[in-house]
Amino acid sequence: MRFSIRAIGKIKEKWMREGIEEYSKRLKPVVKVDVLESDEEKMPENPSAAVKGKVLEKEGEKLLRSIQDSGCVVLLDMNGKKVSSEELAAWIAQKTVMGTSHFYFMIGGPYGNGKNIQARADLKLSMGPMTFTHQMARLILFEQLYRAVKINHHEPCLLYTSPSPRDMRRS
């Protein structure tokens, strides 16, 4: 299985990068993980709806160019489906059983997602009613992917200790 994270914008805070690296390290014994960051497009001050739409389409094009047609695309979107950790784990397991091995998790920039990337999404996923920065959303996504893998392997999700690679292997 492979999780490819595609994101607009870079993680600037060291503590967020370290958190993402930690969850990535925890996932790697059982899942291939890669991240590709694309630069945000410049948004003018007080943009019209048309200008904002064009900027979002450009960012969407950047994300779409980085994926293969055969992968399953999950778009983080505030209007997406709200699921529990267990439901996300079950969805990933179901897609895997149906033959999906590559999941693309797409995170737009601070202004949202263009219609082009929304149209390509196999699942639009919401992190709930609260709003997070796109940087924080990435950290939370990594934690939830780690949790989903642990749930699907019927293993406890140890939050405050670093598991050894042995802890991540299938039983």
Predicted regions and their residues:
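S-adenosyl-L-methionine/SAH cofactor-binding core of RNA-modifying enzymes
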Residues: 39-103
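Single conserved hydrophobic/aromatic residue that forms the stacking wall/gate
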Residues: 160-171
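N-terminal beta1-alpha1 ligand-phosphate binding loop
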Residues: 1-27
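A short beta-strand-loop structural module common to alpha/beta enzyme folds
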Residues: 29-42
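Short, well-ordered alpha-helix to beta-strand connector turns
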Residues: 31, 70-71, 121
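Short Lys/Arg-rich amphipathic alpha-helical segments
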Residues: 14, 21-24, 33, 45, ...
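Structured adenosyl-cofactor binding patch, chiefly the S-adenosyl-L-methionine
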Residues: 111, 115-159
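Short glycine-rich anion-binding loops that position phosphate/pyrophosphate groups of nucleotides
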Residues: 11, 78-81, 109-112
